[in-house]
Amino acid sequence: MKNKLGSLSDPKMFHEPISIQNQDTDSLIEMLSSMIMIRKTEEHLAYGKKHGMIGGPVHLGAGQEAIAVGISQHLNKTDRVFGAHRSHAHLLSLNPNFYKLFAEVLGKETGFSKGMGGSMHLYDKPNGFYGSVPIVAGTVSLAVGAAMAATFQKTDDIGVAYIGDGAAEEGVVHESFNLARMQKAPILFVVENNLFASHMHISLRQPSDMVSRFGIANDIPYKLIDGNDVVEVSNTARELINNIRSGKGPGLIELVTYRWFGHVDWRDDIDVGVERSKDDVQNWKARDPISRLSKSMINAEIWSQDREEELINNLDVELAKSWEKAMNDSYP
């Protein structure tokens, strides 16, 4: 396999605090708070799954929070965002209603999909989230169609399609890239390259580890970046989204990241019986997008450990209340 990602895929790299130069303090606090909220929400889901409170599969995205948070900073409620099977962060970054997510995953009628969808069938159109599905690459063509509809409706709304490196092996993705480029559809393709599709590393599935090569093949402007640097994600997304809204056609952003948990449920070191290197998992955890931003803000004296602890303590209280409420809600 050709290593085109270079140091981006090296788990021993990019452990240092990130650059926050010329960044708005309020935006930094907002992004940090959002990432912490998503992380803590998924910790609750992991606990619930481990202890038999949740039925059905739960795909957790801990370690990947910077991607959805950085991109959602530049989206409107009228944009059309489509997720995949690991989409808790995609939804929560648009609408931080973790109570409704808890209710949905627990199968309660107060959930985002009235308790009928669970973890992988999430829907929140009022906040721009048009759905997630368990079918790999199942929403990509829908996102292109929604983006084209925005053009027909003469709005500056855009479509957003979240896909993983595994989804890039599905034919519909390549058809969607081609159609979007030919029609100049206003859509952002977001490739979350966490190097694994289910339990299989990308080196066992593709001749190159750089998924954005497929964007190049379709003449789609692309950016390849560290997906665990929320400031770089935000800045890059802003540039691409501004171009898309101005009528320049589709864009693609590939973000190299790593999921801390296995493919499904709460275990951190195995994927369908295949053990990942414990050293790699620990090194990737040292590239934690939350701690990297937090350290940068503390170093810049715009944040403190005390403020972060207060934020987490208050969040823990609200999460516990929401979980208990959802547990006591009615089934549909």
Predicted regions and their residues:
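Glycine-rich ThDP/TPP pyrophosphate-binding loop and its adjacent helix/strand module
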Residues: 129-328
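Short, charge-rich amphipathic segments
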Residues: 1-10, 26-39, 78-81, 104-115, ...
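N-terminal start-of-chain detector that recognizes signal peptides
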Residues: 6-8, 18, 28-32, 53-54, ...
